[in-house]
């Protein structure tokens, strides 16, 4: 039972981590393209997701803070 739960949790966490990375890539791509409006919008959607992942323990809170600080 423990192994099954572990595997299920691992897959769930992997999908969440992937989603977080995707949002970060969208922000970076918007900044690189020079489109300020798109960059601001992408950052606004990525920010609460980073906070949520930090709260749930998927990423460290300092890592979330570092990403937000560097992207803002």
UniProtKB/Swiss-Prot annotation:
Transmembrane segments: none annotated. The keyword Transcription regulation does not apply. One of its GO terms (molecular function) is small ribosomal subunit rRNA binding. GO terms for biological process: translation. Keywords: Ribonucleoprotein, Ribosomal protein, RNA-binding, rRNA-binding. Gene3D superfamilies: Ribosomal protein S20. It comes from the Bacteria. GO terms for cellular component: cytosol; small ribosomal subunit. The keyword Aminoacyl-tRNA synthetase does not apply. PANTHER family: 30S RIBOSOMAL PROTEIN S20, SMALL RIBOSOMAL SUBUNIT PROTEIN BS20C. Binds directly to 16S ribosomal RNA. Belongs to the bacterial ribosomal protein bS20 family. This is Small ribosomal subunit protein bS20. It comes from Aeromonas salmonicida.
């Amino acid at each position: 039972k423990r192994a099954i739960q572990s595997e299920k949790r691992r897959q769930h966490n992997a999908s969440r981590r992937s989603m977080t990375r995707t949002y970060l890539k969208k922000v970076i791509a918007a900044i690189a393209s020079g489109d300020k409006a798109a960059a601001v919008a992408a950052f606004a959607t990525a920010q609460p997701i980073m906070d949520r992942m930090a709260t749930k323990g998927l990423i460290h809170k300092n890592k979330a803070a570092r990403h937000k600080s560097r992207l803002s």
